[in-house]
Swiss-Prot record:
This is 2-(5''-triphosphoribosyl)-3'-dephosphocoenzyme-A synthase. The lineage of its organism: Bacteria, Pseudomonadati, Pseudomonadota, Gammaproteobacteria, Enterobacterales. The keyword Nucleotide-binding applies. Keywords: ATP-binding, Nucleotide-binding, Transferase. Belongs to the CitG/MdcB family. Induction: Repressed by H-NS. Part of the citCDEFXG operon. GO terms for biological process: prosthetic group biosynthetic process. Disulfide bonds: none annotated. It comes from the Bacteria. It comes from Escherichia coli (strain K12). One of its GO terms (molecular function) is ATP binding. It holds the Pfam family CitG. HAMAP family: CitG.
Length: 292
């Protein structure tokens, strides 16, 4: 399909550099979905609490999305002289077109809608920073993405109307701001918690997969995951957070033997129909930012 126009301004970014970041985004999505075992989530072992999707759907989806990540980077570069609050409006048509390709690749299954939003924001932030010759670090990328989203929670979650979206309902009932709130705040769960935790475990010599699984547990323990709350309500969310915190307090995932705890957690999540998809999206960002 034809790609939406991004800007009439040209960028000075090398295609090879743009493609390098886009490849990292694709690898981040594949790293997350292939990570196993993950409680309630699709992985190499089972489909978690999802009856409508399989591992291959995520592989096809990630490939479809990879083709659009350069467009987000290019728009971020082309719009570098715009006020940051104006950038999100221009990103939306790119995101919608990317989402359309995702649904075509998966025959209508929503595999990575959250990642299109979050990776799209981070890629646009990278493009802006590169164009302005500013350092590209996890902190600068996330703070730039936050500047794009200024006022987003107020505009989209606090609006009163008769037809509440799922996000608006969870915000009004439980105060959860979900992906919008995390983006507007500059991804503090990633920058302040998941990323330093993951990097510390790697520095200690822990196997990278075990380090990622332990980091997923950390995210599940502290994230007000709207995916979980939409399936299990406040009770389901609090249960999942407590279980993840309990595993962390017992020592977390440090050896292959600890995977038995995750397998049991997975079975319990499936029985309760709970899937921490929001935490999975944040794990994708954690791995992505760890590479830059």
């Amino acid at each position: 399909m034809s790609m939406p126009a991004t800007s009439t301004k040209t960028t000075k970014l090398a295609t090879s550099l743009i493609d390098e970041y886009a490849l990292l985004g694709w690898r981040a999505m594949l790293t997350e979905v292939n990570l196993s075992p993950k409680p309630g989530l699709v992985d190499r072992i089972n489909c978690g609490a999802h009856k409508d999707m399989a591992l291959e759907d995520f592989h096809r989806s990630a490939l479809a999305i990879q083709g659009w990540l350069p467009r987000f980077i290019e728009f971020g570069a082309c719009s570098a002289e715009m006020a940051p609050e104006a950038v999100l409006h221009g990103l939306r048509p790119i995101g919608m077109a990317c989402e359309g390709d995702m649904f075509r690749a998966t025959a209508g299954v929503n595999t990575h809608k959250g990642s299109i939003f979050s990776l799209g924001l981070l890629c646009a932030a990278i493009g802006r920073l590169l164009q302005l010759n500013q350092p590209v670090t996890p902190t600068t990328v996330c703070s730039t993405a936050a500047s794009f989203c200024r006022g987003l929670t107020d505009r989209e979650l606090r609006t009163n109307n008769s037809q509440l979206t799922a996000g608006q309902r969870l915000y009004q009932q439980l105060g959860l701001t979900g992906a919008r709130g995390e983006a507007e705040a500059g991804y503090p769960l990633v920058i302040n918690h998941a990323l330093p935790h993951y990097l510390t475990l790697l520095d200690q010599g822990l196997d990278p997969e075990l380090a990622l699984l332990d980091t997923l547990l950390l995210l599940m323990a502290i994230n007000g995951d709207t995916n979980v709350a939409s399936r299990g309500g406040e009770g389901g969310l609090r249960w999942l957070q407590r279980e993840a915190q309990t595993l962390l307090q017992k020592g977390g995932i440090r050896t292959p033997a600890d995977l038995d705890y995750l397998r049991q957690f997975d079975r319990e999540c499936i029985e309760r129909n709970l899937s921490p998809g929001g935490s999975a999206d944040l794990l994708i960002l954690t791995w992505f930012l760890a590479q830059i």
